[in-house]
Amino acid sequence: MNYLTDKKLTIVGAAGMIGSNMAQTALMMKLTPNICLYDPYAPALEGVAEEMLQCGFEGANITFTSNIKDALTGADYVVSSGGAARKAGMTREDLLKGNAEIAAQFGKDLRNYCPNVKHVVVVFNPADITGLITLLYSGLKPSQVSTLAALDSTRLQNELVKYFKIPASEIKNCRTYGGHGEQMAVFASTTTIKGSALSSLIGSEQLPEAEWKEIKQKVIQGGKHIIDLRGRSSFQSPAYLS
């Protein structure tokens, strides 16, 4: 099986739903065979590792540890979903205090154990803020740390698919701006619908202004909607898009 690279990828928070799905997604996408799973909760972590091994991914070298030093040492790429998840009735910002402390420690661990890491992705909410905190404490360059950014854009695409009843392939360049939270901005300026600018359709019979406002609100509340439906925060979509 040909992988994109053979460099070490460490997944922090691997015993959680996002982390475990990221591990499987990385192997299914053939990103790298060398995956290290880290989580402080050892029993669940071992369970995830066993499941990954039982998948029988060809050429995979899956290791797991509850020692953060061992997990990060030698890592070229790190993805962390190691924060608390949002629950019903919470905003992403409600997670800030606890997850900010986790992000600060994560940044320090990166500085201490893998200062030569190539790239780090921070997934836990509020992702824009926890990513910035990680960056500040890690000493890495801004280009080396990113956060989950594509999910809000795909949520916009999905809402437009449902509204116009056309395939996703006919909706291009969906973009959202600002933080991954309640104050995000949803713009129409770059999006095209079957080759036509979305901005030219807003206010017409095809997309009345009131309908566009409703679509934007659905995008902003996309995560809350998943919690309302499933009783837990999103994990499959952020795991895939990270």
What are these regions (language model features)?
Residues 91-159:
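Rossmann-like NAD(P)(H) cofactor-binding subdomain of soluble oxidoreductases
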Residues 6, 31-75, 84, 90:
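Conserved N-terminal Rossmann-fold NAD(P) cofactor-binding segment
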Residues 28-34, 139-142:
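Conserved S-adenosyl-L-methionine
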Residues 19-20:
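N-terminal Rossmann-fold NAD(P) dinucleotide-binding loop
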Residues 138-143, 152-242:
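C-terminal substrate-binding/catalytic lobe of Rossmann-fold NAD(P)-dependent dehydrogenases
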Residues 23-24, 107:
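Generic hydrophobic/aromatic pocket-lining and core-packing "Φ" positions
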Residues 15:
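Conserved glycine-rich cofactor-binding loop
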